[in-house]
Amino acid sequence: MPVVHTYCSAPISDGAREALKAAYGKAIAAVPGKSEAWLMCLFEDDAHIYFAGDDSEPCALVDVSVFARSEVPAGAWERFTEEVTPVIARELGVDPARLYIRYDATANFGWNGANF
């Protein structure tokens, strides 16, 4: 049940969405037991985002949530960040210094009318 939610202050083209979806689908395999088969991707563009009090340059926040009953190894998150950062920079025009990626693993995830 991985979910990757991308907020960007700039517009996100259809091509960029496809490229990011593909990158997220590949990178999520860094998390043990996760794959693109259950991945949900959400994209919100033209968001009002300030980074360090400034909204004059594009910036982005990527939220990654996964269903996990045990702790996700820190190395998995590191690998995900390393794999997706250059794609986000290229596709969204966001300087990596203006990008946050936030991770959350939870045992509480619902699907199809029930919780796992």
Please annotate each region the language model reported:
Residues 1-116:
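Interaction-mediating elements
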